[in-house]
Amino acid sequence: MRISTSTGTCGSVFWTQKMYYSCEQAIESIAKAGFDAIDLCFVAYGRKGLPMDAPDWRDWVKRQKENCDKHNLPVTQAHAHYYSVAESMKFTALDWEDNIGRIKRDIEAAGMCQV
């Protein structure tokens, strides 16, 4: 059995918009804490202006996977983008397109990490 936790637990505090720790720092902290597997929380790093929202997101994902490998943390789970059902009642077609695009991107990222 592996013991795992999510990078999302290290990135922000109480789901605030501000990220207090980078994914790299979260991975290192999780390894130092003694976990032997990891959940990459792509949704935490996918808001506007964060790495999973950038044009070079694939390069960022590759670096995170390499960092996990360096710390002997197999990626056993990933969290994709999700949205509030209540908020979705107000979505425009562009909002839906953006949300579906983020979900597809996160699924691809999970595949890149062999989840």
Question: Language-model segments: what does each one mean?
Answer:
Residues 1-115:
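N-terminal pre-domain/capping segments
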